[in-house]
Amino acid sequence: MSNPTVLDQIRHIIAQALDKPVETIHAEQSFRRDLGADSLDSVEIVMAIEDQFAVEFDEDSTAAVDTVQDLVTYIEAALASRGAQTA
């Protein structure tokens, strides 16, 4: 069995936080405009992602995230950077 992708894991976190079916969460969707997330939802999502991936967001990073794909890209870069630092 393969590991879930970063996108899959993030989709599940968002679906749980927003109480939506995971099938309705897509990479190109905007958190606020398309998914209806408010600032409290965003905090909940960020905290869950920080726990899941053992990464931390700074204020500038969270301000730059608009879509699900933006979040995936940020997490993948953080994981790659962490991997490069431990290699």
From Swiss-Prot:
Q: Which UniProt keywords apply?
A: Cytoplasm, Fatty acid biosynthesis, Fatty acid metabolism, Lipid biosynthesis, Lipid metabolism, Phosphopantetheine, Phosphoprotein, Plasmid
The reply to whether Phosphoprotein figures as a keyword in the UniProt entry is: yes
What InterPro entries does the database record attribute to this sequence? ACP, ACP-like_sf, PP-bd_ACP, Ppantetheine_attach_site
**Residues of the Carrier domain:** 1-79
Q: Which parts of the chain are coiled coil?
A: none
Location of the protein in the cell: Cytoplasm
The protein's name is Acyl carrier protein 3
Q: Which organism is it from?
A: Ralstonia nicotianae (strain ATCC BAA-1114 / GMI1000)
Which gene underlies this protein?
Answer: acpP3
